[in-house]
Amino acid sequence: MNTIGMDPSGLILDGLTQAIPEAAIGWDMPASSTMPRVRLALDRAAYQTPVSQYMRLRASVYAPQGDGRTCDWPKALALSETICRWLLDNRRKRPLIDASVESGPLQTHDDDLRQDFAYTVILLTVEAA
């Protein structure tokens, strides 16, 4: 069987952009120095069934304070929670079959950017094409 999970990236990006208008959201690091940023990454995982595939959505939320390095944790955690709620509320919208929070939000640090951020992983079940 040569199926592959359908790509939910358009649905996710469009939905989160509408749900969180106060943040810059993208699959690459959004360029913004004035608003919180959300970097998304989607990784394919095992096939749950012959007609569905797991995917992991990683959401990194950067909400820097005035110094540009320390994180506004309440803001970052609130945005992470909004991301999780949107995905759980829309987990039956095709090509999604289901979604669950696998871990997070966790407080962590980006050594390259020298910024703290909130990190969440959501396990998605996606239709196979």
Task: Walk through the language-model features, giving the residues of each.
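A short, hydrophobic beta-strand-centered structural micro-motif
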Residues: 33-43
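Short acidic low-complexity segments
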Residues: 25-34
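Charged, amphipathic alpha-helical segments and their flanking helix caps
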Residues: 1-23, 42-129
